[in-house]
Amino acid sequence: MRIAALDQGTTSTRVLVASQDGSADIQLALRHQQHHPQSGWVEHDPLELLANLQRCLEASGRVDAIGLANQGESCMAWDARSGEPLSPLIVWQDNRTTPHIERLRASGAEALVVERSGLPLDAYFSASKLGWIVEHLPAARRALKAGRLRLGTSDAWFLDRLCGTFATDVTTASRTALMNLAEGRWDPELCALFGVPIECLPEIRDTVGHFGVIGNTPLTASVVDQQASLYGHGCRQPGDAKITFGTGAFALTLSGERIIRSPETGLLATIAWQIDGKPVYAMDGGVYDASAAVEWPGVLACSATSRNWPASTGRRPSTAAWPSSRPCRDSHARTGTAAPARCGWEWTPAPAARTSARPCSKAWCCAAPR
């Protein structure tokens, strides 16, 4: 038996093929463009992601089953009839809805959101992004009026286009702030609060099941990438935990059959997976910019100064080589890093990275309890 594991992530799409003997090999990995039309906005082209997924499927060869891991909170709109995108994929890092989130918080809405979804009010989650799409994009409003609007996270669009199935799994739905965590269904009050038409959202399913076929091959699992990592690392018992270091860094700890709410520490209640209708819960703590926070040297490599660095000597220019040695901040990196903090998720500016050439600090960091 050969199984293709598709991982559609924030910066790349890859496919790993696992065989019955336990061997596993990455067959193909493809990077995609990051779009920043305004400061704090982060978008992907859904058609580029879909094309990369299809190329990965072709590279996997003949397999017996397919699994799909997705970005989680990244979301979009599309036409139910044509399948064409009506919006870009708004990435989880995107913070365009922060003013709206602040207004909701000032109105006292956070208590309801935390109680129902397990998540705090934050632009990170899908709810406010989907509401923004409905409010600001004319194509989405026209589709809504015509009864053709579909809204969802990236997995729902991939499943719709690849399998003809308009569905999402419960782990992904739990990251939207629109799902009632205890009941595993879309919450009408939360949808109304964020301005998201509940009838436009996908069916919520178990993590493992029949999601349709791609060609003649069944897609039998769909899950958020971080939860996939938790399961893949063999975590099964309450207290088992893992930390994944990628674009962001995310810690997940299993809590088993119990939903553990710990708002005073900033840890979020979520679902790790659900099989045969039985949910397994977890606690989540995340840092939005981990490897993303140190990608700026790659950008600097494009500068004339960087191109002229003598590679053979290993020398680096001093800060005097730069027009200003004062630290600056990348205007496209205002997503910030978030981490569990004693009274919620706190945000404080990070000092410039200490390198011999220190032109900017890409990320923000958070004060965590000691």
Features from the language model and the residues they span:
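Short beta-strand-loop/turn "lid" adjacent to the catalytic site in phosphate-handling enzymes
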Residues: E58, R62-W92, S117-S126, D155, ...
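Short, function-defining helix-loop hinge/capping sites that tune catalysis or transport
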Residues: V15, L53, A77-W78, S87, ...
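N-terminal glycine/serine-rich phosphate-binding loop of ATP-dependent small-molecule kinases
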Residues: M1-S87, E115, D206, N216-A221
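Short, acidic/turn-prone active-site loops that include or flank metal/cofactor-
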Residues: L30, H35, I90-T97, T247-A249
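Short linear loop/turn motifs
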Residues: L201-H210, P310-T313
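Active-site core segments that coordinate phosphate-bearing ligands/cofactors
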Residues: I3-L6, T98, R105-S117, Y124-A167, ...
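Short active-site oxyanion
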Residues: D64, P88-L89, A143-R148, E199-E203, ...
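Residue-level signal for inorganic ion chemistry
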Residues: G22, D45, I66, D94, ...
